């Protein structure tokens, strides 16, 4: 707009360099980018549970269908009919036990199961109430994997009621019910912690998408600035005084930029590129271009 109305000409005639003209724009872009990062890392994780819920079920009272989830550490397939977020409860849970834990039966079923976070010496997991399957499970010793209890029974855990059992798992309720959305609303620190969680099975190529997301978050402020410096020369150069032409060119640049960014990230998620390279490759491509274009306005 200042180019179309010759305001830039007046500023340069007064001895104000174009670099000085764009300094407030760059400063504002940096402030916006940093505030976005702070919101993503500090605010959104606090609101993750509400953001992940259906608008018609913000309180979490209505049941949501539970998609089966595999615990890669214990080998248990976690299934159920519905989940209730307000109670962190699974209705009619039916966990399928692996061969290493099926001494009493293949399925572990109950009327309800409640997630309990780690507390004191007790690890986190799911408290089954009114156990239905296997029969007489509550009277038998706990099921162990490599010497570590996985399915605890009242026989070895006095804090359990006579019709209860406790399944130890490092998959919390949000990770069980959220699917991929927990990655979207989690902070970078939570994503890094998820990579080291054996229950989630994100080691190796299975966690490539999470690794790409972590690197992408780190590089995002730099991508924002790169895109800004790609667009500024198109607006401030003397070649385009028509604001609509400048808008069109900026739209084309933004489209090409986003296609490259998303394309590289996709290749990283399917393990055709290393996660770090997938996130940083757009910078390697566009930073030299942005530096070259910046020479057009630095006079």
Segments (PLM) and residue ranges:
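Transmembrane helix boundary and interhelical loop/hinge segments in multi-pass membrane proteins
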Residues: 1-9, 14
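Hydrophobic/aromatic residues in alpha-helical transmembrane segments
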Residues: 4, 43, 230-231, 260-263
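Short helix-to-coil transition segments within interhelical loops
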Residues: 12-17, 271
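Non-transmembrane, extracytosolic/lumenal segments of membrane-associated proteins
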Residues: 27-146
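Aromatic-anchored segments of alpha-helical transmembrane domains
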Residues: 33, 253-262
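Non-cytosolic (extracellular/periplasmic/ER-lumenal) segments of integral membrane proteins
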Residues: 49-69, 115-252, 268-273, 298-299
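Small-residue-rich transmembrane alpha-helices that serve as helix-helix interface/gating elements
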Residues: 276-289
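A juxtamembrane structural motif centered on a specific transmembrane helix
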Residues: 287-299
């Amino acid at each position: 707009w200042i180019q179309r109305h010759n305001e830039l000409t007046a500023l340069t005639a007064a001895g104000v360099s174009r670099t000085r003209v764009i300094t407030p724009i760059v400063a504002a872009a940096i402030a916006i980018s940093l505030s976005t990062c702070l919101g993503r890392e500090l605010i959104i994780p606090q609101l993750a549970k509400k953001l992940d819920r259906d608008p018609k079920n913000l309180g979490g009272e209505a049941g949501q269908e539970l998609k089966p989830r595999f615990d890669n550490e214990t080998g248990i397939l976690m299934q159920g009919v519905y989940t209730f977020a307000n109670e962190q409860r699974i209705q009619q849970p039916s966990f399928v036990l692996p061969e290493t834990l099926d001494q009493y039966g293949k399925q572990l079923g109950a009327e309800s199961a409640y997630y309990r976070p780690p507390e004191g010496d007790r690890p986190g997991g799911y408290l089954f109430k009114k156990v239905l399957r296997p029969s007489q499970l509550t009277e038998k010793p706990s099921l162990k994997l490599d010497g570590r209890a996985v399915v605890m029974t009242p026989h070895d855990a006095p804090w359990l009621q006579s019709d209860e059992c406790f399944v130890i798992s490092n998959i919390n309720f949000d990770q069980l019910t959220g699917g991929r959305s927990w990655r979207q609303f989690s902070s970078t620190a939570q994503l890094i912690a998820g990579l080291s969680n054996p229950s989630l099975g994100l080691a190796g190529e299975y966690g490539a998408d999470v690794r790409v997301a972590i690197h992408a978050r780190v590089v995002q402020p730099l991508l924002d600035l790169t895109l800004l410096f790609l667009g500024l020369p198109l607006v401030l150069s003397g070649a385009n005084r028509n604001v609509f032409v400048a808008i069109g060119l900026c739209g084309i640049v933004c489209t090409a930029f986003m296609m490259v960014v998303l394309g590289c990230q996709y290749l990283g998620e399917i393990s055709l590129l290393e996660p770090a390279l997938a996130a940083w490759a757009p910078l390697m491509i566009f930073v030299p271009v942005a530096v070259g274009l910046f020479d057009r306005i630095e006079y």
